[in-house]
Curated annotation (Swiss-Prot):
Name of protein: Guanylin
Any Gene Ontology CC annotation: extracellular region
Disulphide bridges, residue numbers: 4-12, 7-15
Entry coiled-coil feature ranges: none
Subcellular location: Secreted
Function description: Endogenous activator of intestinal guanylate cyclase. It stimulates this enzyme through the same receptor binding region as the heat-stable enterotoxins.
Taxonomy, superkingdom: Eukaryota
Family per similarity comment: Belongs to the guanylin family.
Keywords: Disulfide bond, Secreted
Length: 15
């Protein structure tokens, strides 16, 4: 769906 499926809003930077 997005860049990060787990943390879309966090931009998968450091989730």
């Amino acid at each position: 769906s997005h860049t990060c499926e787990i943390c879309a809003f966090a931009a998968c930077a450091g989730c």
